[in-house]
């Protein structure tokens, strides 16, 4: 498993919009970014793992869609997420 429940809860606490938030775009983007960074490190050791590379590309696409949605709905929140995660967009 990539993320322990404690790590996931920590990420949710850092990006939640309200007290019971687990599904806002900010939280979803942060969780996807954590999984993407884990897989990126994985591929430094396992260069021929093409099956997982496809999964990585799907995660990147999901994150891109969520970022586009957030940018369209609320540019201020979008810029905040980009800055906090250090993404190049």
Swiss-Prot record:
PROSITE patterns: RIBOSOMAL_S15. One of its GO terms (biological process) is translation. GO terms for cellular component: cytosolic small ribosomal subunit. The keyword Membrane does not apply. Keywords: Ribonucleoprotein, Ribosomal protein, RNA-binding, rRNA-binding. One of the primary rRNA binding proteins, it binds directly to 16S rRNA where it helps nucleate assembly of the platform of the 30S subunit by binding and bridging several RNA helices of the 16S rRNA. Forms an intersubunit bridge (bridge B4) with the 23S rRNA of the 50S subunit in the ribosome. This is Small ribosomal subunit protein uS15. Disulfide bonds: none annotated. The keyword Ribonucleoprotein applies. Belongs to the universal ribosomal protein uS15 family. One of its GO terms (molecular function) is rRNA binding. Part of the 30S ribosomal subunit. Forms a bridge to the 50S subunit in the 70S ribosome, contacting the 23S rRNA. InterPro entries: Ribosomal_uS15, Ribosomal_uS15_bac-type, uS15_NS1_RNA-bd_sf. PANTHER family: RIBOSOMAL PROTEIN S15, BACTERIAL AND ORGANELLAR, SMALL RIBOSOMAL SUBUNIT PROTEIN US15M. NCBIfam families: S15_bact. Gene3D superfamilies: 6.10.250.3130, S15/NS1, RNA-binding.
């Amino acid at each position: 498993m990539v993320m322990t429940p404690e790590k996931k809860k920590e990420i949710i606490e850092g990006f939640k919009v309200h007290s019971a938030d687990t599904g806002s775009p900010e939280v979803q983007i942060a969780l996807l970014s954590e999984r993407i960074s884990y897989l990126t490190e994985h591929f430094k050791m396992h260069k021929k793992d093409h099956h997982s590379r496809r999964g990585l590309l799907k995660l990147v696409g999901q994150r891109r869609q969520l970022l586009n949605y957030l940018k369209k709905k609320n540019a201020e929140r979008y810029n905040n997420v980009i800055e906090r995660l250090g993404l190049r967009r």
